[in-house]
UniProtKB/Swiss-Prot annotation:
GO cellular component: cytosol
Assigned EC number: 3.6.-.-
Protein name (Swiss-Prot/TrEMBL): tRNA modification GTPase MnmE
GO BP terms, alphabetized: tRNA methylation; tRNA wobble uridine modification
């Protein structure tokens, strides 16, 4: 995290990826930009006008020639004076230019993400927009890129700002009621407070669901394959991975440990996890594998519950294995996979029973695997035609979850006790957690972690 002294420094870094290329860009930000331009270029270019110029070192030796651009603050990316030198992309040339700039007093190399950090500190970006820059650079799918662009445009920030405004207005109303104790109960019981609070909770819930999808697009969905031994879990892992990742035999209990495969479906990242078959076992090693299987199941974003279609015709989970589903976390999404349809002669397909997706397939022959792939894409939030939702991170989900807890506690106090002061405090804490998302209220340590993960030059 920057200190006040650091913030006064002028910083320099290569803005293009390291290595050889047709063009290499050196970016400078800070009050010494004009001095850099005068010493390396002979004069400072006109604002926002590209000039083709020779680049010199401080001994007036020619280093390169290329395009120079000057953006005076505050009308620049960082909000400070910014100078960009676009020369040839050889690493030696770029290094010579940067070394020449660093000879000027008051200039130092930029830390990772420091240009974006200065943009945030100068109110050119909020925190979600700054994070979207890093996400856009790191993205590996068109859908994720669209989502990152939506965040960069301020889509996520706008939703949070609207929610914060609603919390502030309700908080003002509640605190006004507290200031008039003789009428406080009338204020709190007139239906406006409870109605507005319920609307805010509903709004937060929808944002939270959208943020979860944005997180899955960024980080990838954790898919855990679970079921009884010999249901075909390892065969399904191999079919999705497109290779023989897991050993497959007719012997029940072959898989005793957790197996992981990182795959992409139309560039959407998925983490597929194969687990030991779930059963009572006297074998100590197999017991450990089963315990690990349950650990993975509890951390999953979605569970694929494998069923041997030869053994049961049941469709509903409670009819297949009620004890297993009783142990699943209450909000855990899952899909029932009826495997081995090549042997049971069930038709391949996908349907729903009581809002539970059921896929009929054969992991061994591959029939129905494409249906499963499409289903998983849908679960992640993939759409070939949409402009994408916004991108989100785990810290955003944590902040939203904390905000939701305080809202629900406030509602409980309102309904049970008409406790205006407690409700006002819960609304204050809600506002604080929401502001952490956009950076209105954020600790220096968190900012250091966020911007430290950026690449240098951004």
């Amino acid at each position: 995290m920057q200190t006040e002294t650091d913030f006064d420094d002028t910083i320099v870094a290569q803005a293009t990826p390291p290595g050889r290329g047709g063009v290499g860009i050196v970016r400078v930000s800070g009050k010494a930009c004009k001095e850099v331009a005068e010493k390396l270029l002979g004069h400072c270019p006109k604002p926002r006008k590209a000039e083709y110029l020779p680049f010199y070192d401080l001994q007036e030796q020619l280093l390169d020639e290329g395009i120079a651009l000057f953006f005076p603050g505050p009308n620049s990316f960082t909000g400070e004076d910014v100078l960009e030198l676009q020369g040839h992309g050889g690493p030696v040339i770029i290094d010579m230019i940067i070394r020449a700039i660093l000879e000027i007093p008051g200039i130092r190399p930029a830390r990772p993400g420091e240009f974006s950090e200065r943009a945030f500190l100068n109110d050119k970006l909020d925190l979600t927009q700054a994070e979207a820059i890093a996400d856009l650079i790191d993205t590996n799918s068109e859908q994720a890129a669209k989502a990152a662009l939506q965040s960069l445009k301020g889509e996520f920030s706008h939703k949070i700002d609207q929610l914060v405004d609603a919390v502030i207005h309700l908080r003002i109303y509640v605190e006004a009621a507290i200031d008039f104790p003789d009428e406080e109960i009338d204020f709190l019981s007139d239906g406006k407070v409870s109605g507005d609070l319920a609307e805010i909770i509903d709004q937060l819930f929808h944002i939270e669901q959208e943020a979860k999808q944005g997180t899955l697009m960024r980080e990838g969905m954790r898919i855990v394959i679970a079921g009884r031994p010999n249901a075909g879990k390892s065969s399904l892992l191999n079919a999705l991975a497109g290779r023989e990742s897991a050993i497959v035999t007719e012997i029940a209990g072959t898989t005793r440990d957790v197996l992981r495969e990182h795959i992409q479906i139309d560039s959407m990242p998925l983490h597929i996890i194969d687990t030991a078959g779930l059963r009572e076992s006297p074998d100590h090693v197999e017991k450990i594998g089963i315990e690990r299987a349950w650990d993975e199941i509890r951390q999953a974003d979605r569970v694929l519950f494998m069923v041997d279609s030869q053994e049961t015709s049941a469709i509903h989970p409670d009819d297949i294995w009620p004890e297993f589903f009783a142990q699943l976390p209450e909000d855990m999404p899952y899909t029932v996979i009826r495997n081995k349809v090549d042997l049971s002669e069930e038709p391949t397909g996908i349907d729903e029973h009581n809002n539970i997706p059921v896929i009929h397939l054969s992991a061994k022959t591959g029939h129905g695997i494409e249906l499963l792939r499409e289903h998983l894409k849908h679960c992640v939030g993939y759409s070939a035609t949409s402009e994408g939702s916004f991108m989100a991170r785990r810290r955003h989900l944590e902040a939203l979850a904390k905000a939701k807890v305080h809202l629900l506690q406030g509602l409980e106090q309102l309904e049970a006790n008409m406790a205006g002061e407690i409700l006002a405090e819960e609304l204050r804490l809600t506002q604080q957690h929401l502001n952490e998302i956009t950076g209105e209220f954020t600790s220096d340590d968190l900012l250091g972690q966020i911007f430290g993960s950026f690449c240098i030059g951004k």
